[in-house]
């Protein structure tokens, strides 16, 4: 056996060498993990800030206020009331002006013709709708998108604007009864209506 092979075997079996290698690998992993954690922390904060800016922008479209709180904790009563209307309650934000609560911005989801419609619904302290805003969606271009884009109805009122002022006192909102639909976009109109009913129910369950 050559001296080179003997030396290699000696190095491979040397406990000090193994310990040194183990420590080196451990420290390297720790440094890499630390760097990745730092980068992730910075990225996470930036993503959270951008998401919050978009959320506030959506809330500003549906209710007038100068202060928007973080999402409230959803209660069982709120989620149950929302589910009973056929939609899904995602988040509820309390809104204030001059330090006084002026209403809520409620993020809900409902089924549309091409998938889930996510929307923000503003509701004042009297329980009346102050506005409806649709989050980017997959509704059909030219038909469902007319509803999403708040296109005017025959009477000139925007299809989303028609919900403003409506409340639980009007009973369950329904297309053909107390809600109008754009011709050819009935499914999308029903989806938005379900979302508004869901938001109204959730608001009514806020303690």
What are these regions (language model features)?
Residues 2-207:
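Flexible, solvent-exposed loop/hinge segments and secondary-structure transition points
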């Amino acid at each position: 056996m050559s001296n080179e092979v003997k030396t290699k075997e000696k190095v491979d079996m040397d406990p000090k060498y193994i310990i040194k290698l183990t420590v080196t690998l451990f420290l390297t992993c720790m440094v890499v993990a630390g760097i990745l954690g730092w980068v992730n922390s910075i990225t996470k904060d930036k993503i959270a800030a951008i998401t919050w800016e978009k959320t506030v922008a959506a809330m500003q479209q549906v209710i007038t206020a100068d202060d928007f709180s973080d999402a409230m904790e959803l209660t069982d009563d709120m989620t149950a009331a929302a589910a009973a209307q056929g939609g899904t309650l995602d988040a509820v934000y309390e809104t204030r002006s001059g330090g006084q609560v002026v209403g809520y911005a409620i993020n809900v989801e409902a089924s549309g013709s091409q998938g889930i419609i996510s929307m923000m619904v503003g509701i004042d302290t009297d329980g009346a709708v102050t506005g409806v805003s649709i989050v980017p969606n997959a509704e059909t271009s030219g038909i469902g998108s007319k509803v999403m884009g708040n296109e005017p109805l025959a009477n000139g009122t925007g299809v989303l604007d028609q919900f403003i002022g409506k409340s639980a006192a009007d009973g369950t909102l329904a297309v053909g009864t107390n809600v109008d639909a754009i011709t050819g976009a009935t499914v999308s109109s029903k989806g938005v209506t379900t979302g508004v009913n869901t938001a109204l129910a959730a608001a009514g369950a806020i303690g």
